[in-house]
Amino acid sequence: VFLRVTNKSLPMGGRRKTEYKKVQPARAPKGDSIEDRPKEIEKREEPFHWEMDSVLSAKEGGSKKRFLTMTERTSRADLMFLMPDGTMASVVAVLDMLEKKLGSFNFRRIFQTITVDNGSEFQDWEGMTRTVEGEGERTHIYYCHPYSAYERGSNENGNRMIRRRVPKGTDFAGITEEDT
Protein backbone atom coordinates (compact mmCIF):
# COMPACT_ATOMS: atom_id res chain seq x y z
CA VAL A 1 0.00 0.00 0.00
CA PHE A 2 2.86 2.41 0.90
CA LEU A 3 5.31 1.32 -1.79
CA ARG A 4 6.64 4.80 -2.50
CA VAL A 5 6.93 6.04 1.11
CA THR A 6 10.49 6.64 2.28
CA ASN A 7 12.10 8.40 5.23
CA LYS A 8 12.27 11.54 3.07
CA SER A 9 8.43 11.52 2.99
CA LEU A 10 8.24 11.99 6.76
CA PRO A 11 8.15 15.45 8.42
CA MET A 12 11.63 15.01 9.89
CA GLY A 13 12.98 13.67 6.59
CA GLY A 14 15.10 10.89 8.07
CA ARG A 15 17.38 13.32 9.91
CA ARG A 16 19.75 11.86 12.42
CA LYS A 17 20.91 13.50 15.62
CA THR A 18 24.50 14.63 15.31
CA GLU A 19 26.90 15.12 18.17
CA TYR A 20 28.58 18.48 18.53
CA LYS A 21 31.65 19.61 20.40
CA LYS A 22 30.97 21.89 23.34
CA VAL A 23 32.01 25.45 22.53
CA GLN A 24 33.04 27.88 25.24
CA PRO A 25 30.88 31.02 25.27
CA ALA A 26 32.48 34.33 24.31
CA ARG A 27 30.85 35.89 27.38
CA ALA A 28 29.16 34.17 30.26
CA PRO A 29 25.57 35.30 30.92
CA LYS A 30 24.93 36.88 34.30
CA GLY A 31 22.11 34.51 35.22
CA ASP A 32 22.33 30.97 36.54
CA SER A 33 23.38 28.05 34.39
CA ILE A 34 20.93 25.28 33.57
CA GLU A 35 23.19 23.05 35.69
CA ASP A 36 21.96 24.98 38.76
CA ARG A 37 18.30 24.32 37.92
CA PRO A 38 16.57 22.04 40.49
CA LYS A 39 16.07 18.40 39.47
CA GLU A 40 12.26 18.67 39.89
CA ILE A 41 12.22 21.11 36.98
CA GLU A 42 14.42 18.85 34.88
CA LYS A 43 12.13 15.87 35.53
CA ARG A 44 9.01 17.94 34.69
CA GLU A 45 7.43 17.07 38.04
CA GLU A 46 6.20 20.61 38.79
CA PRO A 47 4.16 22.90 36.52
CA PHE A 48 4.85 26.58 35.78
CA HIS A 49 8.44 26.29 34.58
CA TRP A 50 8.92 27.69 31.07
CA GLU A 51 11.31 27.60 28.12
CA MET A 52 11.67 30.71 25.93
CA ASP A 53 13.13 31.40 22.48
CA SER A 54 12.70 33.71 19.50
CA VAL A 55 11.87 32.84 15.88
CA LEU A 56 13.45 35.06 13.22
CA SER A 57 11.86 36.67 10.17
CA ALA A 58 13.60 36.59 6.77
CA LYS A 59 17.29 37.46 7.10
CA GLU A 60 17.91 39.19 3.76
CA GLY A 61 16.02 42.45 3.43
CA GLY A 62 13.08 41.29 5.56
CA SER A 63 11.47 42.98 8.51
CA LYS A 64 13.09 42.85 11.93
CA LYS A 65 9.98 41.34 13.52
CA ARG A 66 10.35 38.15 15.55
CA PHE A 67 8.13 35.77 17.44
CA LEU A 68 8.88 35.29 21.13
CA THR A 69 7.77 31.76 22.01
CA MET A 70 7.28 30.37 25.51
CA THR A 71 6.57 26.70 26.28
CA GLU A 72 5.48 25.36 29.67
CA ARG A 73 7.58 22.27 30.45
CA THR A 74 4.93 19.93 31.91
CA SER A 75 1.78 20.75 29.90
CA ARG A 76 3.66 21.84 26.73
CA ALA A 77 1.33 24.88 26.57
CA ASP A 78 2.66 27.48 24.14
CA LEU A 79 2.52 31.27 24.17
CA MET A 80 3.60 33.32 21.16
CA PHE A 81 4.14 37.08 20.95
CA LEU A 82 5.12 39.25 18.00
CA MET A 83 8.07 41.55 18.77
CA PRO A 84 9.09 44.54 16.62
CA ASP A 85 12.74 43.44 16.67
CA GLY A 86 15.17 41.07 18.39
CA THR A 87 16.48 43.42 21.03
CA MET A 88 16.75 42.83 24.76
CA ALA A 89 14.30 45.69 25.30
CA SER A 90 11.64 43.92 23.20
CA VAL A 91 11.91 40.74 25.29
CA VAL A 92 11.68 42.72 28.53
CA ALA A 93 8.69 44.66 27.12
CA VAL A 94 6.81 41.38 26.47
CA LEU A 95 7.51 40.16 30.01
CA ASP A 96 6.47 43.55 31.42
CA MET A 97 3.22 43.42 29.42
CA LEU A 98 2.49 39.90 30.69
CA GLU A 99 3.17 40.91 34.29
CA LYS A 100 0.90 43.97 34.00
CA LYS A 101 -1.93 41.87 32.53
CA LEU A 102 -1.63 39.04 35.06
CA GLY A 103 -0.58 41.05 38.08
CA SER A 104 2.70 40.58 39.89
CA PHE A 105 1.45 37.80 42.21
CA ASN A 106 -0.03 35.71 39.37
CA PHE A 107 3.00 36.26 37.14
CA ARG A 108 5.33 34.97 39.86
CA ARG A 109 3.09 31.94 40.39
CA ILE A 110 2.69 31.09 36.68
CA PHE A 111 6.24 31.90 35.49
CA GLN A 112 8.34 30.52 38.35
CA THR A 113 11.38 29.92 36.14
CA ILE A 114 12.25 30.59 32.50
CA THR A 115 15.03 28.75 30.67
CA VAL A 116 16.57 30.59 27.71
CA ASP A 117 19.48 30.19 25.30
CA ASN A 118 22.46 32.53 25.12
CA GLY A 119 21.05 34.67 22.30
CA SER A 120 21.72 38.39 22.40
CA GLU A 121 18.01 39.09 22.99
CA PHE A 122 18.19 37.27 26.36
CA GLN A 123 21.32 38.95 27.77
CA ASP A 124 19.40 41.53 29.87
CA TRP A 125 19.17 39.29 32.92
CA GLU A 126 18.29 42.15 35.27
CA GLY A 127 15.51 43.42 33.00
CA MET A 128 13.94 39.99 32.62
CA THR A 129 13.99 39.22 36.35
CA ARG A 130 12.99 42.58 37.86
CA THR A 131 9.33 43.16 38.58
CA VAL A 132 7.44 46.21 37.32
CA GLU A 133 5.37 46.33 40.52
CA GLY A 134 7.09 46.54 43.88
CA GLU A 135 10.41 44.92 44.65
CA GLY A 136 12.04 41.56 44.18
CA GLU A 137 12.30 39.09 41.33
CA ARG A 138 9.34 38.31 39.11
CA THR A 139 10.91 35.07 37.82
CA HIS A 140 14.18 33.15 37.87
CA ILE A 141 16.17 32.87 34.61
CA TYR A 142 18.36 29.87 33.71
CA TYR A 143 20.70 29.90 30.72
CA CYS A 144 21.39 26.81 28.57
CA HIS A 145 24.84 25.81 27.40
CA PRO A 146 25.91 27.37 24.08
CA TYR A 147 24.73 25.48 20.98
CA SER A 148 22.63 23.09 23.09
CA ALA A 149 19.09 23.59 21.82
CA TYR A 150 18.16 20.12 23.10
CA GLU A 151 18.21 21.55 26.64
CA ARG A 152 14.99 23.38 25.70
CA GLY A 153 13.56 20.56 23.62
CA SER A 154 9.86 21.29 24.11
CA ASN A 155 10.33 24.88 22.98
CA GLU A 156 12.38 23.85 19.95
CA ASN A 157 9.66 21.38 18.91
CA GLY A 158 7.08 24.15 19.23
CA ASN A 159 9.24 26.38 17.04
CA ARG A 160 9.45 23.56 14.50
CA MET A 161 5.63 23.51 14.37
CA ILE A 162 5.62 27.27 13.75
CA ARG A 163 8.06 26.76 10.88
CA ARG A 164 5.61 24.33 9.25
CA ARG A 165 3.16 27.25 8.91
CA VAL A 166 5.74 30.02 8.46
CA PRO A 167 8.79 28.54 6.66
CA LYS A 168 12.29 29.97 7.08
CA GLY A 169 12.82 32.94 4.82
CA THR A 170 9.24 34.18 5.28
CA ASP A 171 9.04 37.91 5.96
CA PHE A 172 6.96 38.69 9.07
CA ALA A 173 6.21 42.26 7.88
CA GLY A 174 2.57 41.45 7.05
CA ILE A 175 1.91 39.51 10.26
CA THR A 176 0.02 41.24 13.07
CA GLU A 177 -0.36 40.38 16.76
CA GLU A 178 -3.89 39.11 16.00
CA ASP A 179 -2.48 36.64 13.45
CA THR A 180 -0.38 34.98 16.14
Locations of regions flagged by a protein language model:
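Short, acidic, Ser/Thr-enriched surface-loop or helix-capping motifs
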Residues: 72-73
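Mobile-element integrase/transposase regions
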Residues: 6-67
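Short helix-terminating capping/connector loops at secondary-structure junctions
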Residues: 105-110, 136-138
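Active-site beta-loop-alpha junctions of metal-dependent nucleic acid enzymes
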Residues: 63, 80-105
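Mobile genetic element proteins and their domesticated derivatives, centered on retroelements
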Residues: 53, 76, 95, 114-117, ...
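Short small-residue beta-strand/loop micro-motif enriched in glycine and branched aliphatics
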Residues: 76-81, 168
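Major-groove recognition helix of helix-turn-helix-like DNA-binding domains
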Residues: 1-5
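RNase H-like two-metal-ion nuclease catalytic core shared by retroviral integrases
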Residues: 116-118, 123-126, 132, 141-164, ...
